[in-house]
């Protein structure tokens, strides 16, 4: 099948057909195909846009540089959040290949994005990376004054299963000056983290 047919499949209501198109593109991409997918990051058709995001993830590391550029430089909030989600998909689709330093630093910088849709998407992407970036998540949690971002960071730290997060979450729980919802989230997250970290040690 042609690339054009695969792109048409990305619009299909059936997720199995979309997946076929996604992997068809990922197996036959070039720079022009990546540019075409990048142009869909603000597509109004959410099914098509999400399929483009997943396809950029399926392509993998060849899409990281343009995704980071879009994440940090686009004026369009939808493009920035889609770029963060696509970087998460790179990690999900290629678990045996660490995200490049460029990708990690791009996500770290995007934690400071003023738009919550973008900074929370970046936190979620870093949560997918897990233990290799837990120190960056901890650093962001210790310095942010944004409660919504802090809640996302707490959950991402817990999801990594890295024991380094336990003391950080305990400090928030013990800090009576901290936002009450952030403390509440840390309380529920720490038990999850202790359980997962305990399994990893055994």
Curated annotation (Swiss-Prot):
Keyword Transferase carried by entry: no
Coiled coil: none
GO cellular component: phycobilisome
An annotated Gene Ontology molecular function: oxidoreductase activity
Expression induction or repression: Present in both red- and green-light-grown cells.
One Pfam short name: HEAT_2
Superkingdom classification of source: Bacteria
Alphabetical keyword list: Antenna complex, Phycobilisome
Keyword Metal-binding: no
Name of the protein this chain belongs to: Uncharacterized phycocyanin operon protein Z
Organism phylogeny: Bacteria, Bacillati, Cyanobacteriota, Cyanophyceae, Pseudanabaenales
């Amino acid at each position: 099948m042609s690339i054009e047919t695969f792109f048409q499949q990305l619009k299909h209501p059936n997720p199995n057909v979309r997946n076929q198109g996604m992997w068809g593109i990922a197996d036959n991409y070039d720079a022009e195909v990546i540019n075409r997918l990048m142009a869909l990051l603000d597509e109004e058709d959410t099914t098509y846009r999400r399929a483009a995001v997943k396809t950029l993830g399926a392509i993998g590391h060849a899409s990281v540089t343009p995704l980071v550029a879009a994440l940090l430089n686009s004026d369009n909030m939808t493009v920035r959040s889609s770029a963060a989600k696509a970087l998460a998909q790179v990690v999900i689709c290629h678990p045996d290949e660490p995200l490049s330093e460029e990708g990690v630093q791009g996500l770290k910088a995007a934690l400071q994005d003023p738009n919550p849709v973008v900074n929370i998407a970046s936190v979620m992407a870093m949560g997918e990376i897990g233990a290799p970036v837990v120190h960056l998540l901890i650093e962001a949690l210790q310095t942010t004054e944004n409660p919504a971002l802090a809640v996302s960071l707490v959950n991402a730290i817990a999801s990594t299963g890295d024991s380094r997060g336990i003391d950080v979450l305990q400090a928030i729980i013990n800090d009576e000056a901290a936002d009450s919802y952030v403390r509440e989230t840390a309380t529920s997250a720490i038990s999850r983290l202790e359980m997962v970290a305990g399994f990893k040690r055994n």
